[in-house]
Amino acid sequence: MNLKKIIRQKIFKPYSLRYEKSKNKIIKANIDLIPNGKILDLGGNTGERMKSLFPNKTEGIYITDISEKALDVAKNHNGYNTILLDESGNIPFEDKYFDLVFSNSVIEHVTVDKNQVYNITSTKTFKEQSLARQSRFAEEIKRVGKKYFVQTPYKHFIVESHLWFPSLYLYLPRKIQIKLIRFLNKFWIKRTSPDFSLLTINDFKGLFSEAKIIKEKSFFLTKSLIAIKN
């Protein structure tokens, strides 16, 4: 086993598992989960989060993602309804169709077209275009969900979770960020694409002004932000 695998399995994986269990506790403590309700998991990948929250329920749960491969597992292995989304952020359901909309570490990726990620090197342009799409995505969540739970990593936490790297690099001009990510992807313990735009507390409150905002802590510091409407 090489050093990168050892670090991932011995340090980051146990930390991530503890963090996910903590997040499930927050969900159960703040959302009145309806056993027979309709639930939408936006960016739900293979559906593992829903399986951990509702181990005996598949009916009425919809998993959406932009990955056909992930949705194939969600449908054929885990038994969920699946919807393939495009990158626009539009959700193809009528108003208040779902009793609960769930989104975990997704909205920060609702930014620009994936094929333009490396081409947009202006920090201002990327932020403005990203925030416009994130705003539309947030409005869609509020439109289709009676209740919602939306989580996103906090921009000013000490470690940037997509790269597992000190978050100071986020304050560099985007052009340099892209070069740094390309360089680190050659050997670093975690690879990523510069397709994400992390949110500040004010950004997040602006997107979900009607919601209760929870600051999820790690080592006494705010690690992620959660918007809850119950």
Feature annotation, model-predicted:
Residues 1-32:
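Class I SAM-dependent methyltransferase Rossmann-like catalytic core
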Residues 40, 45-90:
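Class I SAM-dependent methyltransferase SAM/SAH-binding core
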Residues 102:
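A conserved beta-strand element that flanks and buttresses the S-adenosyl-L-methionine
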Residues 105-109:
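Short catalytic micro-motifs in class I SAM-dependent methyltransferases
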Residues 110-142:
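A short, conserved alpha-helix within the catalytic core of class I
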Residues 114, 133, 140, 147-175:
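Conserved class I S-adenosyl-L-methionine
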Residues 190-210:
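Short alpha-helix
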Residues 213-230:
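Core SAM-dependent methyltransferase catalytic element
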